[in-house]
Amino acid sequence: MLDVQVDEFTLVLQTTKKPYSIETWSGMAHALINEFTRLSNIELVLGELEDSTDSLPRGYSHGLSCKDKPYYFSVAYHTDFIQMGVCIKFSAYAWMKYREQFEKLFNQPVQIHQLISNIDNTNLYTSRLSRIDIAIDYIDEDISVNTIYNQLSKKNQIVKTASGRNNLSSLSALTKNNETSTFYLGTKGKNIKALLRVYDKKKEQTETMGSRFKEALQYSNWVRFEAVFKGEYAHNISDELKSIKKDVELKNLLVSALTDRYQFYYTKSNRLTTYSKSMLNLLDKKTFMFSSPSPRMNLLEQSQQHILNGSGLFPYLFKIRHIWGEKGLKECVAFLNEEFNNYEPNDDVMLWLKKYSAMYTQQGYPFK
């Protein structure tokens, strides 16, 4: 049996109205949180939320979490960085409990596309995924993590994308007594958009007494393929989720997303492995492919986005103006301009200009 599901995910809410000042952002963030909790029925379903400063999503300063619950759910914001929005983080266990309790309370099931549809019924904010973990479970299918890893490490099997290109993600594993129970395709990191973890789910649940321990005992074999998608890839999936109406469409999207990046082939015959073919057989139709980034991304546009959203320049200028007024701000900008005029570009900058100047001259300004 193969089962497809969303494991964990993170949403970010962005206000549709910019606050007048940084001082008004906290009040606005709480308004967004209140609207989310109302539309999601989160406190009715998961339990009372209380102020929390522990275990907030990384980078956020203030937030709420479920009181006295074994699962991790958090709503958070940063008082000084409006562009970070309001972060909604469901752990896998919290999402499982939310779905269970929601169905008991409202006598109808709920999936991620329905949750997003419910919380988007507002003019206060927009929502978008910043992370989503997609899991495909092989239950009693008699496949071995150790065997797959050994075949990959010996180059007897390779990984390709749906377009037929080799997936060159690095391979690593957790091995004990010559037995591999978990391996990764890709590396963990802040700017990594995709990572695949393949692991023995039964072993994980029974050894840690996890939330699905009793279920794991019922199976003789349980292997999970779990893909983590972040950043632009998560945004692509988020956009697709908003057009979904049926559970079968959700299944097609989740399987399409995972197999768009990860398909396993026998090297010599160039044919799909049996387990990868089983995954593709879940599809009624291929519904989704990750959009290819423009070749000019990671160039001027990314630098510009970093300056606008991540560099701290605007908070710095705001503080200058708040302390010394418009006169101080003008003097600060003049100081920065003088420093820029004294700047000497290094070799990397000159090589970049040699490579891309003609393209940008023809294309026009990125700051329109």
Residue ranges of each PLM-predicted region?
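Structured, helix-rich domain cores that form ligand/interaction pockets
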Residues: 1-297, 306, 310-368
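Helix-turn-helix DNA-binding segment
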Residues: 300-302
